[in-house]
Amino acid sequence: VSTSNDRIKVWTRIDLTFRASTKFNNPYADALVWVDLEGPDFSRRVYGFWNGGDEWVVRVLANAPGEWHWTSGSSPKDAGLSGQSGRFVAESWTAAELDANPNRRGMIGASANGRGLQYADGTPFFLLGDTWWSLPSFRFPLADKATATGTLGPQSTLNDYVAVRKAQGFNCVGLIAAQPAWANDGKPNSLQMDDGTWVRAAWKQPGTQSAKDMHNEGGRPFEFPGKVPGFEDVFPDMDRINPDYFKTLDRKIDYLNEQGMVPFIEISRRDSGQCWQKFHDWPESYARYVQYMIARYGAHITLLSPIHYDYYEQTIPAEDYNVPINLAIERYGKPPFGTMLTANPNPSTLVNFGTDSWIDLHQSGNVREHYTYWYLTEMFEAERKPAINGEPYYAGLHQLGEPYPLRVPPDSEDDRIYVRSGLYGSFLSGGLAGFIYGAEGIWQSDVEPESLHKMWDSFGWESGNQVQHLKTFATVEGQRYLELTPCTEMVVPNKTGPGYAYKGWSYCAATPDRSLIMLYFEADAPMEARLRGVRPGDRFLPRFFDPRNGNWHDPGEAISVPRNGVLPLPPRPDAMDWGLMLQRL
């Protein structure tokens, strides 16, 4: 972070701080601050946010080398907020500096063909994420940067967890910025008003019947008392924000960015929707919060989501969230420095928000078994935007409300098979931009003595270590994977076994000219398989991939497509899951 008025590096955040002369009753809602920022091929109004007391901050950066200048404004006009100006000069990073932290390459955006992701300078970004929904809370304490040891246990810090995942090739973590009504307050974790309105649908804190605590050293994200009759001490006033809570989150986001990690920030979970809509000025109140979070984190290297819509129950319809989200974008514009907008959806961003929406990065989410990977194919065919599976099967999954019917011992081979099904089945179904992993104990950040799986133990599970092999599989031919089109029906058979499972199915994706064909066979898929849709007489070099260790086997003997155009595939090494590449000779 820089507050300098002279020389900085490109893609370095600058906090421009202003002190208001006016004493506002509710600064969060009563004033708007901005700077008009001008630079090389850039001219944009960048909005700021209230940061507590009389302080407002506008966060800016330079996306290109050269001279930049800004002038501030506010509504209502204020002597301390309006009419200020400044300048700075941006310089490029050296090659060594770029190698030290890839986030210095700029914001994440879509690849040239719209199927993958890349940094602003064009360097490919294959997203490999982990699910740390509770990162803003005390459950992920941030230590002195010099003390991270990588040793996992009750004393573990955010620094330790980042070190572990960074060493395993992860480059992204997902988090929910605010769980407004969640606290271990002695009241049930799921609360409804007499008329059925949902007050909260929280995760249960182990050892209690109440909701999980989600505060941090700055407190909780919004102020009390709230406006919901009878629940003023449970559901806060969503029109009065607590900047101290977000200052703590700032430091964690800063640390992630310094470590080369890209946070995927979801600003709120869907269970706050009914009381927010019913007892506040909707859509204005939610649109204000959307803009606040874009202003606060739009100059970090992040992915931003205006709603964590992981389920369509205990909330308002997705189209009702669309109203304030679109209002914020129409009024203030999309994030000024190119931050992609996305969301965790159920079952997909396409189903919930449609085509030609504010979505920049499509996701499937909170749907798990292999029959759901098709949603990625549907998005692939609907429009040319990158896509990922953002919430597949959780390693060690025990229950989601009810005990999970397919649960297996955590970190068993079956558990790892389930995870790998999600990794490779999703990729070949159209999720070419990457994948977000999750594990029991980590996704809900269990630290209590009564927890079934404590999060520091779950970080040691082998399935997390195997996630990095997806990139090895995808990039065997460099960036050619971005040319792949899902075509599972080319491989026969491809669906032996039930849809509500992770075994027995096969997947296929190929380049349009069929010169590169990638396949994945789940465990227990038939050993004999054939490939149709290839040209008689063409010859292919087969090569198997072991998703357990990331090793490509030596190529086998060339195989030729017979006159009927149906190619018998070589049997995989055993009945476990395997990847296969066919290169046309």
Locate each region found by the language model.
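Non-catalytic, glycine-rich low-complexity segments
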Residues: 1-41, 46-48, 87-94, 501-510
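Aromatic- and carboxylate-lined catalytic core of secreted/periplasmic carbohydrate-active enzymes
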Residues: 2-6, 23, 27, 123, ...
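Short tyrosine-centred short linear motifs in exposed loops/low-complexity segments
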Residues: 9-12, 54-56, 60-72, 76-78, ...
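Active-site mouth of glycoside hydrolases
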Residues: 32, 102-105, 111-372
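Extended acidic/polar, glycine-enriched regions
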Residues: 36, 42-114, 135
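Surface-exposed loop/edge segments in extracytoplasmic proteins
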Residues: 40-47, 549-557
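Short proline/glycine- and polar residue-rich coil/turn motifs
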Residues: 50-52, 559-565, 572
